[in-house]
């Protein structure tokens, strides 16, 4: 059974910002928006602000936002996990979980990101193009949509609402 390939986001374990394992099966029954984040990107302010707005509005209806810091794009996430948490929580009042810094591309890409990319390739192939690429994952752990870094979080609200309304 252990060799069975992982077909659901819920099959993965990731590290939180303190280095503790988090089994993503704890999010079964939740709608997930998974985002690679950075503190020093031109997209940072708008994305963190809108992600926080979405989270505040829909967290009680079953939305979870999982943020994965990544330093692969323009070295725009140079801080350690503590600095990243401090930045997101103080500056943007982010209440959603921010996990351990990961690679999203290349040989050392986090297994979760390999799965996300193989489930929903981008317009120009599988690789993540920049900070704030977004993946929408349904309550069963299936990747249902991928959004470009420039897609504003509020512009996908209709997709979130639709998926929250399904069983």
From Swiss-Prot:
EC number: 1.11.1.12
Record Pfam families: GSHPx (PF00255)
GO cellular component assignments: cytoplasm
A Gene Ontology BP annotation from the UniProt entry: response to oxidative stress
Keyword Flavoprotein part of the UniProt annotation: no
Keywords of this entry: Cytoplasm, Oxidoreductase, Peroxidase, Stress response
Compartment list: Cytoplasm
Catalytic activity: a hydroperoxy polyunsaturated fatty acid + 2 glutathione = a hydroxy polyunsaturated fatty acid + glutathione disulfide + H2O
GO molecular function: phospholipid-hydroperoxide glutathione peroxidase activity
CDD domains: GSH_Peroxidase
Active site: 41
SUPFAM superfamilies attached to this UniProt entry: Thioredoxin-like
Function: Protects cells and enzymes from oxidative damage, by catalyzing the reduction of hydrogen peroxide, lipid peroxides and organic hydroperoxide, by glutathione.
PANTHER family: GLUTATHIONE PEROXIDASE, PHOSPHOLIPID HYDROPEROXIDE GLUTATHIONE PEROXIDASE 6, MITOCHONDRIAL-RELATED
Family: Belongs to the glutathione peroxidase family.
Protein's UniProt name: Probable phospholipid hydroperoxide glutathione peroxidase
Species for this entry: Citrus sinensis
Gene label: CSA
């Amino acid at each position: 059974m252990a060799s069975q390939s992982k077909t659901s986001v819920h099959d993965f374990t990731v590290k939180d910002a303190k280095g503790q394992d988090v089994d993503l099966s704890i999010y079964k029954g939740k709608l997930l928006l998974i985002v690679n984040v950075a503190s020093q990107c031109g997209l940072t302010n708008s994305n963190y602000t809108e992600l926080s707005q979405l989270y505040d509005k829909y967290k009680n209806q079953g939305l979870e936002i999982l943020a994965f810091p990544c330093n692969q794009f323009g070295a725009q996430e140079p801080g350690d996990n503590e600095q990243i948490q401090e930045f997101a929580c103080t500056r943007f009042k982010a209440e959603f979980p921010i996990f351990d810094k990961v690679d999203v591309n290349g040989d050392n890409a986090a297994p979760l990101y390999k799965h996300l990319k193989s489930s929903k390739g981008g317009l120009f192939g599988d690789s993540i193009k920049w900070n704030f690429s977004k993946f929408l994952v349904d309550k069963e752990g299936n990747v249902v949509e991928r959004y470009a870094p420039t897609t504003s979080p509020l512009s996908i609200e209709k997709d979130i609402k639709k998926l929250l309304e399904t069983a």
